[in-house]
């Protein structure tokens, strides 16, 4: 285990004195109607949470955690789930909240929830009863906030959730293909909370309850607010000067020609004089009370290099131990982003997950099936955060790089609660995991490094020597969990970070011997160095080593088990040749992927910055810095996706065209080393039939002989018709 962290909160999450309404006690379910409020004896709600998801009282759903957390502090909390956004009426169903509205789009970004990576409308929604689509609007955070303001203009609105969190600064919006302002500006909300919200939510709620106004609360970590100028007492630095070196002292001459000559006189010893010692106060750390001024919204919208620069700065200011505040101008005001909150301790995590969740959907949904709940109802979240730092993923920016783990006892208690109380439990726990399966209790072994490090990833390009890779706590947890009475099987469904796992083969043996149901998901994402370097993913050497150990331990356990690798197509940095090599690798290893994913440019991700700007924010940004190859356009993105499904006959014509254009005709045919078969006679006939009705596009620059050939061919086919 690592030493005691230097990153400590000012106070414990549960140290606040309870609000007076604690006398009502916890509600069976947080109320969604006035009738439920009446049954609880409430005349009003102190806080109302508005969400784009169905209300499931389970710790995998953000609104359940936030609601139960606030309830434990003594507040009366109501839920408005998936309201009708066409008018303000549905937002008034619980009356006027005494303190504030909390608004979130839900567990997913509403645009990703509603649209595919090809910008096509989805026809389902896993967070809605019976999987019905269309129960939340586009950009739900904006719409819900506007309706809350229409309903009660004088009630503060606080934004939260993944959608608001990843849009806290000016950001590239894939769906409109433009740079948009911070969601705080567009929504006109009073405050935005990014990342995990327990600490800021509890502090702001108590301070509002004690009489402060929302405008007076400006210093809470993990929050963003609108200001006209920097906060008093803070000093700033322009982001464009952070990489500029300071004054450099001249190097002294090694032979001392410029030194004064000696006069050969005896030197009298100096008398030692007593000096008063002045005790200086401790110097403030360089990141305390310091903010970075990012390029303004107007500048990053008009200059892609400045956009990439701003993104790079933001990603380096995510360590709660040393992060500085950020300030970005929007028009005549600024978005002020306070440093990230201090991670929860193990004791605080245990308390959050011990709150009185019912672990089922609200009774108002009756027998309706909620797919997202069905997926996780027998799974357990054992930790938060991820130090992988993958460029295409926003977990690190949302949950942080420091792993926040629950205690073994807390997890065992939850397994027993599922066994004893959740309807339909058959003895199988579907997952013990989190963002990554095998980062439980892993953290930096050096408290000083943990506090001051600004690395984007603790495992790329190599695993940091300070990072703990001992999987003993995870192994002990697995062993204790599967010994529980009534538990038949503990499965691991979260993705395994295989480059960490190979550092402790005992974990792979434990996993393969007891916790795999035939298939194990891992995510190499690609095989080629070009895209892997932009994704910040390890090379295939780690994958090969993991597969070797996994196959060995599966065989020793007498089990036939397989790895299911996940890959991303059309990621920035990927050339057509890279995708061909990946397809050849898949064929060589006899993989036929059914579900494949094109890169989806989500807000705030480093990969999205590459997609939009063509620059690499993983290194220093400049107008002459590295350019990144970006697969854009529907045809190229379709080609990259088709190459992942090289075995699908529907993709063969497109793949053949690409191979011919790349000069790789030798990969077309029936030989073992070929990627796709040659076209059949029927396919060639069909191609000729399709070309029969086409005409050459002739211009005045077309050579005369070609014009005559084209006219003759047209007359022969159409007998001169259509001229």
Swiss-Prot record:
Keywords tagged on the record: 4Fe-4S, Iron, Iron-sulfur, Metal-binding, S-adenosyl-L-methionine
Residue ranges under compositional bias (Basic residues)? 714-723
Q: Which cysteines are joined by disulfide bonds?
A: none
Q: Map out region (Disordered) in residue numbers.
A: 686-723
Where [4Fe-4S] cluster binds, per the record, is at 386, 390, 393
Locate the Radical SAM core domain: which residues?
Answer: 372-650
* Pfam families the record matches: DUF3362 (PF11842), Radical_SAM (PF04055), Radical_SAM_N (PF08497)
Q: Does the keyword S-adenosyl-L-methionine apply?
A: yes
By its UniProt entry, which InterPro entries does this protein fall under?
Elp3/MiaA/NifB-like_rSAM, Methylthiotransferase_CS, rSAM, rSAM_horseshoe, UPF0313, UPF0313_C, UPF0313_N
What domain of life does the native source organism fall in? Answer: Bacteria
Q: Which cofactor does it need?
A: [4Fe-4S] cluster
What SUPFAM superfamilies does the annotation carry?
Radical SAM enzymes
Q: How is the cofactor bound?
A: Binds 1 [4Fe-4S] cluster. The cluster is coordinated with 3 cysteines and an exchangeable S-adenosyl-L-methionine.
Q: Which GO terms describe its molecular function?
A: 4 iron, 4 sulfur cluster binding; catalytic activity; iron ion binding
Has the keyword Metal-binding been applied to this entry? yes
Coiled-coil ranges from the UniProt annotation: none
The entry's family comment says: Belongs to the UPF0313 family.
PANTHER family xref list:
UPF0313 PROTEIN YGIQ (PTHR32331:SF0)
Return the protein name.
UPF0313 protein YgiQ
Which organism is this entry from? Salmonella typhi
């Amino acid at each position: 285990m690592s030493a005691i962290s230097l990153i400590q909160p000012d106070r414990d999450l549960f140290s606040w004195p309870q609000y007076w309404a604690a006398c009502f006690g916890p509600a069976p379910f947080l109320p969604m109607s006035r009738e439920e409020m009446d049954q609880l004896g409430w005349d009003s709600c102190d806080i109302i949470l508005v969400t784009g998801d169905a209300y499931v009282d389970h710790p995998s759903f953000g609104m359940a955690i936030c609601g139960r957390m606030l309830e434990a502090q003594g507040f009366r909390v109501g839920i408005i789930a998936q309201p009708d956004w066409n008018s303000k009426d549905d937002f008034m169903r619980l009356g006027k909240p005494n303190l504030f509205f909390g608004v979130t789009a839900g567990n997913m970004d509403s645009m990703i929830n509603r649209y595919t990576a090809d910008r096509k409308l989805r026809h389902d929604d896993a967070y809605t009863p019976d999987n019905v689509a269309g129960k939340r609007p586009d950009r739900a955070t904006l719409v819900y906030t506007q309706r809350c303001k229409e309903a009660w203009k004088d009630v503060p609105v606080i934004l939260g959730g993944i959608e608001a969190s990843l849009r806290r600064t000016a950001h590239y919006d894939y769906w409109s293909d433009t740079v948009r302002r911070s969601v705080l500006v567009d929504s006109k909300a009073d405050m935005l909370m990014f990342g995990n919200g327990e600490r800021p939510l509890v502090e702001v709620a108590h301070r509002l309850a004690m009489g402060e106004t929302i405008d007076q609360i400006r210093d809470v970590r993990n929050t963003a607010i609108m200001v006209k100028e920097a906060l008093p007492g803070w000093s700033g630095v322009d982001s464009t000067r952070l990489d500029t070196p300071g004054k450099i002292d001249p190097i002294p001459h090694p032979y001392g020609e410029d030194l004064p000559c000696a006069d050969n006189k005896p030197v009298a010893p100096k008398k030692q004089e007593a000096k008063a010692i002045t005790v200086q106060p401790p110097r403030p750390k360089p990141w305390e009370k310091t903010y970075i001024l990012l390029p303004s919204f107007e500048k990053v919208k008009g200059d892609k290099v400045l956009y990439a620069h701003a993104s790079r700065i933001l990603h380096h200011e995510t360590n709660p131990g040393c992060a500085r505040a950020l300030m970005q101008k929007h028009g005549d005001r600024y978005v002020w982003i306070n440093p990230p909150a201090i991670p929860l301790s193990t004791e605080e995590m245990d308390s959050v997950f011990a709150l009185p969740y019912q672990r089922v959907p609200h009774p108002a949904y009756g027998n309706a099936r909620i797919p997202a709940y069905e997926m996780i109802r027998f799974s357990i979240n054992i930790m938060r955060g991820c130090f992988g730092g993958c460029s295409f993923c926003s977990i690190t920016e949302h949950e942080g790089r420091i792993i926040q783990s629950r205690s073994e006892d807390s997890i065992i208690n939850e397994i027993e609660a599922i066994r004893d109380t959740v309807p339909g439990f058959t003895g199988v726990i579907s997952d013990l995991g989190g963002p990554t399966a095998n980062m439980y209790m892993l953290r930096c072994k050096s408290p000083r490094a943990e506090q001051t490090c600004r690395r984007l990833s603790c495992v790329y390009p190599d695993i940091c020597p300070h990072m703990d890779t001992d999987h003993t706590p995870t192994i002990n947890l697995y062993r204790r969990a599967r010994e529980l009475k009534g538990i038949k099987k503990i499965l691991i469904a979260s993705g395994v970070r295989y480059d960490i796992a190979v550092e402790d083969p005992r974990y792979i043996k434990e996993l393969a011997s007891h916790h795999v149901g035939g298939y194990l998901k891992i995510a190499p994402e690609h095989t080629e160095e070009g895209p892997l370097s932009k994704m910040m993913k390890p090379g295939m050497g780690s994958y090969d080593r993991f597969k070797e150990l996994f196959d060995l331990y599966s065989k020793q356990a007498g089990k036939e088990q397989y790895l299911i690798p996940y890959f991303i197509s059309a990621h920035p940095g990927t050339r057509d040749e890279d995708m061909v090599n990946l397809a050849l690798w898949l064929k060589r290893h006899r993989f036929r992927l059914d579900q494949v994913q094109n890169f989806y440019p989500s807000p705030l991700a480093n990969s999205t910055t590459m997609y939009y700007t063509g620059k690499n924010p993983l290194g220093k940004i400049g107008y002459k810095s590295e350019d990144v190859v970006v697969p854009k356009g529907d045809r190229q993105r379709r080609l990259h996706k088709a190459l992942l499904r090289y075995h699908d006959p529907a993709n063969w014509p497109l793949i053949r065209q690409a191979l011919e254009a790349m000069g790789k005709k030798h990969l077309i045919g029936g030989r073992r080393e070929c990627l796709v078969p040659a076209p059949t006679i029927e396919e060639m006939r069909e191609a000729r039939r399709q070309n029969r009705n086409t005409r050459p596009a002739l211009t005045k620059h077309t050579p005369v002989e070609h014009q005559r050939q084209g006219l003759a061919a047209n007359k022969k086919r159409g007998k001169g018709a259509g001229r």
